[in-house]
Amino acid sequence: MKRFWQIAVLLSFYITVQAVPAPPAESDITRLFEQGFGQELLFFMPEKLPLEIERIQNTMVKKLDQYVKAGVLTRENTRFLAEKIMYGEPREVSVGGYTYKLNEASQWVSPKGIYYGHPRIREILEVSTPMDINGRIYCEVYLSWYADQLPEWLDKIDWRAERALKRARESKEKPFEKRLNFEFKDGKWDIWKDKAPQTLF
């Protein structure tokens, strides 16, 4: 009887192992990454826009003016009320300044911000062994990716001053790294999708 149960346990283990599929092939991972993230455009906002600032805010004016010259922001002269301390008391006074907005006429601009590239897979670093968790089969893929098709406007600004843009410019040599969960469903692997979708950041 003991021998029977040993065989039953081994057989059950063998069936369970056999039921778990092989991990996704690198070609499938690349294809699924391109489908899931390759068309996902990357957007950047130098500040929360539209933004109204005084002319005397030289540092901010200098920062935003380079985006105006690059054609992705617009600048308009304006006057608005600002609180100033006068004679020891706060008062609202009319000041001269600028209003900065996204340049909707630019091909690089959308309501989401300023386009600065889109993801491309760089290297598949590791693929875990598939696991059955509560009747659902998952595996984890550790990969690196970079920002591709960087737009020309980046060459017209000091991109080193903005971390997101700096990382994008350097990402071919220093790629981003990400762990993504994959699920085996309906006989094939796919990027795991839940109520909160996986992101690259």
Question: What positions do the PLM features span?
Answer:
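Hydrophobic h-region of N-terminal signal peptides that target proteins for export
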Residues: 10-18
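Sec-dependent signal peptide recognition
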Residues: 2-10
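Short beta-strand edge/turn micro-motifs at domain boundaries
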Residues: 140-142, 147-148, 168-201
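Mixed-charge, low-complexity intrinsically disordered segments
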Residues: 89-103, 149-173
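Accessory beta->alpha helical hairpin/"wing" motif in late/C-terminal subdomains of nucleic-acid enzymes
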Residues: 74-116
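Basic amphipathic alpha-helical segments that dock to polyanions
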Residues: 57-75, 79-84
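Short amphipathic alpha-helical interface segments
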Residues: 20-54, 58
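Extended amphipathic alpha-helical interaction segments
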Residues: 104-139, 148
